[in-house]
A protein has these predicted regions:
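Loop/turn-to-beta-strand initiation segments
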Residues: 39-42, 66, 89-93, 107-110, ...
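Conserved motor-coupling elements within RecA-like helicase/translocase cores
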Residues: 58-94, 105-108
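Hydrophobic residues in beta-strands of the RecA-like P-loop NTPase core, especially within AAA+ ATPase
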Residues: 96, 113-114
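Post-DEXD/H (motif II) to motif III coupling segment of the RecA-like Helicase ATP-binding lobe
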Residues: 25, 110, 117-186, 197, ...
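Pre-Walker A (Motif I) flank of P-loop NTPase domains
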Residues: 9-16, 24, 39-42, 91-92
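Glycine-rich phosphate-binding P-loop
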Residues: 1, 16-28
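Pre-Walker A adenine-sensing motif
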Residues: 1-9, 31
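Conserved Walker A/P-loop ATP-binding site and its immediately adjacent core
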Residues: 22-27, 34-59, 78
Length: 204
């Protein structure tokens, strides 16, 4: 958390590179609570709304009706209702997909872009064509808000930007709560081909 705060104080957005189960969600929640306590609102971007179960449960328990959702599966009526609540500053935390970037936010203080590497932020088959990550950073600049891009496997462009000082790079290399890393085995496929005839399937 200290490194994240240092980067944000320097006026930089943050690339949070954390291995699976490293505690990214825990850090997100801390920054969300801090932002709300400071009287600002939060936009939590996801490539797919189905990825939100863990964080939704915790936020719903604490913020109730101040938590909102926006995605393509909503009806037109539901979308208008969310638009109205955002406009009237009734929603403090909005969890949504890329289309939520066009909502009339009030007093936005933090944008979290989770799974920032995901291609769903820049689909080629869905109109309008735009890169949601780039749009989110522009939105953060417009509102003078902070932005955190999180991923276990950062995109090349975000990693490059971090290494060139445009983003604050924060690496979480250990699993949260001493959760063990998965075991893996390096396989030599040149040797494997010769033995494939002797078994139904080789290790993957």
């Amino acid at each position: 958390m200290t490194e994240i705060n240092e980067g944000l104080r320097e006026g930089k957005n943050v690339l949070l590179h954390g291995v699976t189960s490293s505690g990214k969600t825990h850090l997100y929640l801390e920054k969300i609570e801090e932002t709300i306590a400071n009287g600002k609102n939060v936009l939590f971007l996801l490539p797919e709304i189905a990825l939100t179960k863990q964080i939704i449960q915790r936020l719903e328990k604490k913020y109730g009706k101040q938590l909102g959702f926006y995605h393509q599966k909503l009806t037109d009526f539901e979308k208008v209702e969310v638009w109205r609540k955002v406009k009237n500053n009734e929603i403090k935390i909005l969890i949504g997909t890329r289309s939520s970037l066009f909502l009339p936010f009030q007093n936005l203080g933090l944008i979290i872009i989770d799974e920032e590497h995901d291609a769903a932020y820049k689909p080629r088959e869905v109109k309008p064509f735009f890169n949601a990550k780039d749009a989110a950073l522009v939105l953060a600049y417009f509102y003078q808000a902070k932005a955190i891009l999180g991923s276990a496997t950062p995109s090349v462009e975000s990693y490059y930007a971090a290494k060139n000082g445009k983003l604050k790079y924060v690496f979480l290399g250990e699993r949260f709560g001493e959760v063990a890393l998965p075991k893996y085995e390096i396989i030599n496929f040149k040797i494997g081909r010769a033995s494939c005839r002797e078994r139904v399937s080789s290790p993957v």
